[in-house]
Amino acid sequence: MGQRIPVTLGNIAPLSLRPFQPGRIALVCEGGGQRGIFTAGVLDEFMRAQFNPFDLYLGTSAGAQNLSAFICNQPGYARKVIMRYTTKREFFDPLRFVRGGNLIDLDWLVEATASQMPLQMDTAARLFDSGKSFYMCACRQDDYAPNYFLPTKQNWLDVIRASSAIPGFYRSGVSLEGINYLDGGISDAIPVKEAARQGAKTLVVIRTVPSQMYYTPQWFKRMERWLGDSSLQPLVNLVQHHETSYRDIQQFIEKPPGKLRIFEIYPPKPLHSIALGSRIPALREDYKLGRLCGRYFLATVGKLLTEKAPLTRHLVPVVTPESIVIPPAPVANDTLVAEVSDAPQANDPTFNNEDLA
């Protein structure tokens, strides 16, 4: 049997790890709607430390969106999308849903972010040229089979839409190559099995719920009783399929087969944010928690997965020479002009000052 190592605040299991040969490393990100703000925090901490030893990336729904920002090396991007765009009424509108429209407008979200905050796909292309692969999971609408798409400049945004098309809330689904797709979380919310199938020996899995959370059977029984004889019966069948798949994935993570090693990063308790309709303060708290969990992972596990240690947060103190030269004082009314970097997201003040703990 393989090995599962839980990584969260308050868990000391990572502290007892010994050096090992990781082999092919995969980064797998769970969906979860706005709960993906936790994943955004973890991945922003990875980017701050320039930590990217992964050979393979797999994500579903919000996990695919977060990984897109990580692969394009845009720190702060996913946090902005979740906190500034998914909280707008243009995206999430219960009144529109009651009137027969979509509860979530993925078309608006994708178009707005693409025009105002485009992904740096050229950066990702160079990563792919080096031999690394990224797969986004979407689920076929006809038989619920999971499909894994390699994004290109031409289809990247369409695949994100397909992977995030929550059934019932985005009624039409997304058509790719003549086939209708829905949210990949229906059949493969955490694509760990696909990562293992593609040869990964070490998996770093970022969850958006505490580990070992299962669905409550009583909840399903009530829903079946309420909706069993209605026109929503297909939706009940779909949710049951998702529940069975999710339970199977959870058991795979808890008891990895063979010599597979799984590092599971997860929040120590349920997040303040929810899948849709979260408040800004809740999102901010969960983002900070993700940053802290990412930092804990880097301090304990990160150095074992790469030959080059992750960058530390604190710099080595500068030795001051004995003779100190004091420059002339600036004119009192001079305006301080800060140097501006052209790097994507580099001038995001909220990101730079976020969570300095």
From Swiss-Prot:
The active site is at residues 61, 183. Pfam families: DUF6363, Patatin. A motif (GXGXXG) lies at residues 31-36. One of its GO terms (molecular function) is hydrolase activity. It comes from the Bacteria. It is an enzyme of class 3 (hydrolase). SUPFAM superfamilies: FabD/lysophospholipase-like (SSF52151). GO terms for biological process: DNA damage response; lipid catabolic process. Residues 27-196 form the PNPLA domain. InterPro entries: Acyl_Trfase/lysoPLipase (IPR016035), DUF6363 (IPR045943), NTE (IPR050301), PNPLA_dom (IPR002641), YjjU-like (IPR037483). A motif (DGA/G) lies at residues 183-185. Its EC number is 3.1.1.-. Keywords: Hydrolase, Lipid degradation, Lipid metabolism. PROSITE patterns: PNPLA. A motif (GXSXG) lies at residues 59-63. Probable lipid hydrolase. This is Uncharacterized protein YjjU. It comes from Escherichia coli (strain K12). The gene is yjjU.
